[in-house]
């Protein structure tokens, strides 16, 4: 039974990730006045399956100078963490109901840094290492703001449990009262997942492909799946934190449909941003965080600490 539950949990994520790549290519295509994939199957719908078959049937090559064990472990770790981050998310029921769900997700997103660092270091090439160092600095930096925003949400919510957030937002979505935090959270998730306009880790013009430049076939596909699973997980988190993932506790199917639609719209915005904005310069990326986001999030955090003290009330505040 446990194996069946695990498969029912993993397979939908894999299918969603596979077709997200197709939606991205189609969306970017139409935004650039071209068709996108349209040969494999009707309207190109079988393109993700063709890509998967191609990648997993190729021979996985590696540099002679690479560190074998770490080179293989890095993509497996990336994919495992990308799947594990989904377990505490209430959709509307979670696979594991954790009291410290918010902390668990923050810890896992911090662990994903190791897969990037190991892949860059184990490749033993300068471009991969430079890409990995960039990615690690960027990810660790933006986790600071994500942690402070989560602390502010926790102060409003009154606990670290994700299910409590649904109860907090029964009357009003948190985006209504904390819209500056929502904007900063969304931009930080773009940087955290290494997406455009913050995709400096891939920097094609100077780093070829970034930390995964030496990967091919199956291991490369694992990194690819992990990246898109993380994107969807982050958007699912945004939905739970700010967009009130539940409508009516009596209709769980309606709640799930609402959750999926909101997450899909947020994910489409990721693709829209990629099509619209040019890449940031690295110093601009760091200045945005340390000179703009950090002071603002700290100020908002102090504000949310002072409200219960000033009004002598206990959370949830909404």
Curated annotation (Swiss-Prot):
GO molecular function: NADH dehydrogenase (ubiquinone) activity
Top-rank EC class of the record's enzyme: translocase
Membrane-crossing residue ranges in chain numbering: 2-22, 68-88, 100-120, 136-156, 172-192, 223-243, 253-273, 294-314
Pfam families documented for this protein: NADHdh
Organism: Trichosurus vulpecula
Signal sequence range: none
Catalytic activity: a ubiquinone + NADH + 5 H(+)(in) = a ubiquinol + NAD(+) + 4 H(+)(out)
Assigned protein family: Belongs to the complex I subunit 1 family.
Protein's job: Core subunit of the mitochondrial membrane respiratory chain NADH dehydrogenase (Complex I) that is believed to belong to the minimal assembly required for catalysis. Complex I functions in the transfer of electrons from NADH to the respiratory chain. The immediate electron acceptor for the enzyme is believed to be ubiquinone.
HAMAP family assigned to the protein according to its UniProt record, in alphabetical order: NDH1_NuoH
GO biological process, one term: aerobic respiration
This protein's UniProt keywords: Electron transport, Membrane, Mitochondrion, Mitochondrion inner membrane, NAD, Respiratory chain, Translocase, Transmembrane, Transmembrane helix, Transport, Ubiquinone
Record-given protein name: NADH-ubiquinone oxidoreductase chain 1
Subcellular location(s) of the protein: Mitochondrion inner membrane
Topology term for the membrane: Multi-pass membrane protein
EC number(s) stated in the UniProt entry for this protein: 7.1.1.2
Gene Ontology annotations for the cellular component aspect, listed alphabetically: mitochondrial inner membrane
